[in-house]
């Protein structure tokens, strides 16, 4: 008979690569998968802006709200450019992310109209800034549109290139005969107001909307403009009108244009085309949700436990969803992979059936370069041949929602486990490299950890906290413990924090009162003892594990 915790695990069902909850069908973004990506994006009459992301990535979580808001505000452009997302943390999408060279999240790629993937079109990366704002996204996107037009593409867009003439005489020279009215927004050189309004109103007939920059000094002088933005209205008879009030914001500027056109018997057109379609929402509640909640509560009561399931899932995720998405691994990346596999081979709690798997991986990396798909094949073969003792899902690292905890939590635990066991297994080895595990972690996070902002933070912290100066194996355990607490302190109260698992300094006074001095300072010797007890090989919990894989003698 199954024990209560094991029964709950069965009832909760598998959550190995769940569909992320950052984007939903009701959002104004197109949800792409491997099943529809090529059908929608390749040879499309419109351009596409695709964000490649992972739902667990903190930077992606911060990026999602402004990206969705941008999609909403750009909805009138939908016949020109589609705003979409594709989740690379869903294993089914790995081939797409690998083929398009997506190794850091979030990555936004622009695919111009009529892209041909077989011809080598992989899209162009659109810069992103931190902190992320809707305005920054718009600015970078519109600059991309302008670059496309300057390079002879972007034929679907209205004219977004700056008006360069010194007067208005040639304004209509390149316009069709049915264009009767022109609106020229003269603005600061770092403004994109004119371009945004031109895109919003691109379907309005008989009208062209252009923009000029204030560094066009001859035009500014000839029109006697002293304030920016200024709206210049011109018709075919060269009648001009200059408006400087109530046009600083998009809504006001569009209202001014609409009012002028209404007096001419014309109406602005700002229709929003339909979306191409999305994954459908399940109208029924998840019958397994209650079991999952109960399971989390049971696991939480077990305290600071380390589960074999989290360690194995972390390793498989790292190899299948990060290393494998790199199309070709060579140079520094390959050296980092070798170092990572070296500490995995030495210290990871594999079962007895793992020798050929880990040897095949290390032999693969002995060449000058490795294809990511080769790593994927070896891990999938290992899964099929019983190398791993657990299903691919998180247990102690399962968050209250799919976007919380998960892989980052398990990766921290994996490296804590490796640092502790490098101490325990090298007691008599005075020549052991004190930064063997930390160096492998640094290389992995730098070259493979796909949350770009997280990777940058860790690399910066490693430099500031002198990772390379660690002089003993026990010091490496404490270095990583302190670094993790620094991250916990920085992320406490952040939007990425799981409300059911608030960030705390670890270990808590409740779990390890002896770790605290009377004045609240850390007693590091006690902390080290606690970490050794927690992460020692014989402390690992095997809930949900097939122990016959780990300890074959048990079935006799």
Regions found by a protein language model. Give the residues of each.
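Non-catalytic interaction/regulatory modules that flank or connect domains
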Residues: 170-236, 240, 321-326, 337-347, ...
